[in-house]
Amino acid sequence: MILLISDLHLEQERPDITRAFLDLLAGRAREAESLYILGDFFEVWIGDDAMSPFQLSICKALRELSDSGTRIFLMHGNRDFMLGKGFCKAAGCTLLSDPSVVQLNGEPVLLMHGDSLCTRDEGYIRMRRYLRHPLTLFILRHLPLGTRHKLARKLRNESRAQTRMKANDIVDVTPDEVPRIMQQFGVRTLVHGHTHRPAIHKLQIGDQAARRIVLGDWDRQGWVLQVDEQGFNLSSFDFVPETVALLN
């Protein structure tokens, strides 16, 4: 069994999401061969040298899962693209490049965060290219912590404001980009997150059937894609209210 999740946006202000994730680690993930986290794992990440006590607790929880035998793979999202080798080493996980092709159930599957598919949002794509440049990353990682915190808040607020103003089709994936990149990597299954629009889309690429599986964000409920001998199953689950969790 292999599990894939994305867009948890973990932060101390959302203990319900944190509890649901920790429950997943202590339960179903212990029985899994691998856990893939496809970006926006944290709501914000300003550097491995600036881990808060909350983020450190998540790191330790991942390490416990890794030590139990489950392999963990982590991909950058647009909120946590500064996650580095230091965190991954401490958490016992492997950093995946975006995009990556992996074998799931004997089938090559393309994994992405999904933001690079939104090519109609030209302003965002330009900003993404700038922020992911090695020189920009080097500069960001060497800024004072206070400056990084302020910059992260500014970028997050601007991102939220711009997303609210943009048309839905602009912030969703570009339809023509999906078959193009699937053909480029020679796959018939694509799994990604980012858009917060969970679904399984059936496609036709040439004369072959294909599918695009969109993982859901963890806001009002959690989403998990489970891959096993039964196939690919995308499902959601409700969070346990924090008041109940505290009593157990």
Swiss-Prot record:
GO MF entry, a single one: manganese ion binding
Positions contributing to Mn(2+) 2 binding: D40, N78, H113, H194
Species assigned in the record: Pseudomonas syringae pv. syringae (strain B728a)
Protein name: UDP-2,3-diacylglucosamine hydrolase
Binding residues annotated for Mn(2+) 1, in chain numbering: D7, H9, D40, H196
Cystine connections: none
Membrane topology value: Peripheral membrane protein
Record has Transmembrane as a keyword: no
Annotated substrate binding sites: N78, R79, D121, S159, T163, K166, H194
A GO CC annotation given for this chain: extrinsic component of plasma membrane
